[in-house]
Regions:
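Sec-dependent signal peptide recognition
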Residues: 2-8
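A periodicity- and composition-biased signal for non-globular, repetitive helical segments
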Residues: 8-9, 23
Length: 269
């Protein structure tokens, strides 16, 4: 898939408003390097098997008395049944099964302590899981979250899906106000074929603002100032949760499994 895109690029050179509908076209698969920026980190998922241990770590220990936050219902594992690279694509697989006193399993992968960065662009080409109750997310946390706590460390949600509308994807920025209380701002887009086609989810992050895109259609801009925690390094997180507050707690009773596929993730500065 990525090799075909490169060939297409070589051939070429040799010859916000919410609920904006993003249509599917052939150009969405071509993702050249942004002008003036250099690729500083990527995973093309070209080696089949377990995701690279030099780039990813698995979070498997629930932090909230045996559960994850937001009333989620999954147990995250590092098993190949829940995360694997096959045919050049990372697959994070949510499954209905009894495991460690939970009814669902999935995976949560991060680059914590392996890679973090401040400012630049993140490009992620992904196909989202289908099914009511799945909550896929491509997002980031501040490197200092262990000491500063959340939301003081800041959170950048490049893409979330599962808010009850099959085509709705959203991007959010979470932080604390002057009283230490959590608040967030969100932008949304309606896209077609989110679970059958790959789309490119993009963050542009500078010292003054963050911009969020799907297939180069911008749907959210967040202005940054020096009182906010977005002038420090952040690390990446990929996961598929089940149920939880974001999905209104509704899981299809006939759900068996669903997969988020990631063709690549690239970070530029």
């Amino acid at each position: 898939m990525k090799k075909i895109n490169l060939i297409l690029i070589l051939l070429i050179f040799s010859c916000s408003k919410n609920d904006t509908l993003v249509s599917q076209d052939n150009t969405q698969n071509i993702d050249p390097s942004p002008n003036g920026l250099n690729l500083i980190w990527s995973d093309e998922f070209d080696v089949d098997g377990t995701p690279s241990s030099t780039k990813w770590v698995f979070e498997t220990v629930p932090p909230n008395n045996g559960s994850w936050w937001n009333n989620e219902e999954q147990y995250y594992t590092d098993r190949r049944e829940n995360s694997i690279v096959e045919n050049g694509v990372l697959k994070i697989i949510a499954k209905k099964e009894n495991y460690e006193q939970k009814s669902y399993t999935s995976a949560r992968m991060t680059t914590q302590d392996l890679f973090d960065f401040k400012f630049g662009e993140v490009h992620i080409k992904a196909k989202l899981p289908a099914g009511q109750g799945t909550w896929p997310a491509l997002w980031m946390l501040g490197k200092n979250h262990a000491t500063a706590g959340w939301p003081q460390c800041g959170e950048i949600d490049i893409m979330e899906h599962g808010d009850g509308n099959p085509g709705l994807v959203s991007s959010s920025v979470h932080l604390a106000n002057s009283d230490g209380n959590h608040y967030y701002l969100r932008g949304e887009q309606i896209i077609e074929n989110e679970s059958s086609d790959f789309h490119i989810y993009k963050l542009k992050w500078s010292s003054s603002k963050m911009e969020f895109f799907v297939n180069d259609k911008r749907h959210h801009v967040f202005n940054v100032n020096n009182t906010m925690p977005f002038d420090q390094p952040f690390f990446l997180i990929f996961n598929v949760a089940m149920g939880g507050d974001f999905t209104n707690g509704n899981i299809d009773p006939n759900f068996l499994s669903a997969t988020m596929e990631v063709d690549y993730v690239r970070v530029y500065q």
